Regions:
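Extended alpha-helical coiled-coil "stalk/arm" regions
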Residues: 166-173
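Hinge-like oligomerization/junction regions that interrupt long coiled-coil arms in large cytoskeletal
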Residues: 2-166
Length: 173
């Protein structure tokens, strides 16, 4: 009943080249817990009354009156959502993510990229509000061990297994 946003979204398989850039863009919000409104007061009081030693973010879904149309190149259009989500929660989450990340995806910078206020490139360059340019290279785009979104953990598991095998081989030398 209290999923992290990361647990209910993942990049659609046909768009998997965008997984790394989208992971970087959405990482902070992906680690946010979705709390139903009936539990929001208790959750907020618990956060206020307890020192948890970690950063915790919660969000309480609001009602959304209309369905939002997404550009096919938008970040949100490249996401799949868990089918177990109730329709109202799904509608809210799509709108919430689009509001936070209205970015369009571009293979590389160019004229159209320059004319768009919110953009994301395959190399992980993020342009927000036409003036904030960011690139977080704290981990490689292809490094699935740092990915948090998705219910299919096989890419992350494979990366971790490969790393473990490599480390064991180095130790055995």
């Amino acid at each position: 009943e209290l999923p992290f946003i990361a647990e209910v979204i993942q990049v659609v398989p046909d768009e998997n080249k965008w997984t790394g850039p989208i992971e970087r863009l959405m990482r902070s919000i992906s680690l946010t817990i979705i709390v139903p409104s009936k539990l929001s007061d208790k959750a907020e009081a618990y956060l206020e009354d307890n020192h948890l030693g970690e950063k915790i973010s919660i969000v309480c879904p609001q009602s959304v009156s209309k369905e939002i149309k997404f550009d096919e190149d938008s970040v949100v259009a490249k996401l799949a959502f868990r089918t177990e989500l109730e329709k109202s929660r799904l509608k809210w989450l799509r709108a919430f993510l689009y509001e936070k990340f209205p970015h369009l995806c571009f293979e590389q910078r160019g004229k159209k990229y320059d004319s768009i206020a919110n953009a994301l490139t395959l190399e992980g360059l993020v342009k927000t509000e036409g003036m904030i340019i960011e690139k977080d290279d704290t981990f490689f785009l292809e490094d699935a061990s740092n990915w948090v979104t998705g219910w299919d953990v096989s890419p992350k598991q494979k990366t971790l297994d490969d790393s473990l095998t490599k480390w064991r081989e180095e130790v055995d030398r």
